A protein has these predicted regions:
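Conserved alpha-helical scaffold segments that buttress catalytic/binding sites
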Residues: 2-318
Length: 318
């Protein structure tokens, strides 16, 4: 079987105007069954979709995120390059991970793909799907950079539920911290008081996690919080995990669990650009965008905007 399904070529938007280039013109599509030949492609950024919300359903959430990868690619590939960019990105779209095999096998294959990208020195953006796929991204990253990996999770929820009741969208960082205990720096940012149990917070802290609640962010600012956390991590590699429910429901209504409280786009983009300019950020995953629950495609466009910021923040730095 093929583990990846190629992205629809019709998503590669173009105005057919050399004076108005779009990101869709910067994308190569990985052909089916060519996953083993990634080293043959010339690219700066890989994009991978996880069209799978089984883990959300298993955690009692509202499903719909399985259609997110396509709905995020659509506005992303219509965007223009950044106004301050002097070069165009070379993007390799790997397509979407197959979801016919059992969930655990899908997670392991996703992890294998991410590790392959990370080991090649390339950067990536992934689109969920449930946040259980944060396991694929974070562990594929951590195994590639043992002892120098930093994972920052922007989220309303801890997502450190134990796996004794099975895998689901609440378990990715329980798995990461259990498997890579003492080998990865891990921070949770934007944690909301009404969304988490004290048991989960205590467990994460026992594994070395740094926790910054939404109250902390509101008191000190997102940028200042991240600057302080990263001040002694200049030499390390970073992966950013973004559960879209970290944002307010006004800005990201299309997700399984949204609240009126949360992060704001403006502050996040400011912090993202600072991190990209000052640190080595290898990848970013965006999870739990649920287009059936969205309003005017706001949440899909937010995810696309964050991806655009990641791509050009890295490209302009170079």
């Amino acid at each position: 079987m093929s583990w990846l399904h190629p992205t629809d070529k019709h998503l590669l938007f173009t105005k057919n105007d050399k004076e108005d280039p779009r990101l869709g013109e910067c994308v190569q599509l990985l052909p089916k069954d060519d996953l083993g030949n990634l080293s043959n492609y010339d690219y700066d950024f890989a994009i991978l979709g996880y069209p799978d919300d089984e883990g959300i359903g298993l955690n009692g959430g509202r499903v719909g995120a399985q259609v997110a990868p396509r709905e995020i690619r659509t506005p992303l590939y219509k965007m223009t390059p950044h106004l301050h960019s002097t070069t165009l990105p070379k993007i390799l779209d790997l397509g979407d991970l197959d979801k016919e095999k059992p969930l655990a096998e899908r997670h392991e294959k996703g992890r294998e793909i991410i590790a392959s990208i990370a080991q090649s020195g390339k950067r990536w953006v992934s689109f969920g799907g449930g946040h259980d796929y944060g396991y694929c991204d974070s562990t594929g990253f951590a195994q590639t950079f043992p002892g120098e990996a930093v994972v920052i999770n922007f989220d309303a929820h801890m997502d450190v539920r134990p796996t004794d009741k099975g895998l689901n969208s609440g378990t990715p960082f329980f798995r990461l911290l259990s498997e890579f205990s003492g080998q990865v720096d891990f921070a949770e940012v934007g944690i909301q008081n009404q969304c988490n149990s004290q048991f989960h917070v205590t467990w994460a802290k026992s594994k070395g996690a740094q926790i910054f609640t939404l109250d902390d962010i509101n008191s000190h600012g997102l940028l200042a919080t991240l600057q302080n956390y990263l001040k002694d991590k200049k030499s390390k590699k970073i992966f950013l995990s973004v559960d879209i429910d970290a944002f307010t429901s006004n800005e990201a209504p299309g997700c399984s669990q949204s609240w009126t409280t949360g992060l704001f786009t403006k502050e996040f983009l400011e912090a993202l650009q600072w991190i990209l300019k000052n640190h080595d950020v290898r990848g970013m995953g965006i999870y739990e965008v649920s287009p059936p629950l969205d309003s005017d495609k706001r949440t899909s466009k937010l995810a696309a905007l964050l991806s655009h910021g990641f791509i050009f923040g890295n490209l302009n730095k170079a």
